[in-house]
Amino acid sequence: MSDKYFVDTNILMYAHDRTAGAKHDRAKALVEELWRDRTGVISTQVLQELAVNLQRKAAKPLDALATRDIVADYLTWQIVVNGGDSILGALELETRYQISFWDALVVHAAQSAGTQVLYSEDLSDGQLYGPVRVINPFSNDVRWGDQSEPTGQNADQLSLSDTPERRKVC
């Protein structure tokens, strides 16, 4: 991977949730690759949703300190800060593509970062939003970073561990 790749919250959640089976394995491998290549992009919205979901929606919710450690690790990624222009842009995308405001805010952040790929399970696999293509990393025939049309808790269960070169998702 050499370009930048935007990652939606659900992919990060699966990467940390050992109870998610095959989705955990795929998400973990993707996130580790993005860390290794330093090509991961997220937004403040994704970080906020991740923090809430780790504490409230995970199979075994984490406490605030464990959640803080995970979120802090992602601060090494490129982060799109959502502001007023982001909200206005998302409202335009919401109308144009008939998607939820929150999904439109993610798409707008991906566009703002100049990414061409948005990894998400929530949006339609293969859908183009201007220059940004959604790729569902859980669809059977996905090759990460492929720009062509895709064909197809407690701290023990939700955690990160450090390695010298990068973070490693458990």
Segments and roles (model prediction):
Residues 76-121, 160-166:
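Active-site neighborhoods of divalent-metal-dependent phosphate/nucleic-acid chemistry enzymes
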Residues 42-44, 119:
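Short beta-strand segments at enzyme active-site cores
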Residues 39, 78-80, 133:
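Conserved beta-strand segments of alpha/beta enzyme cores
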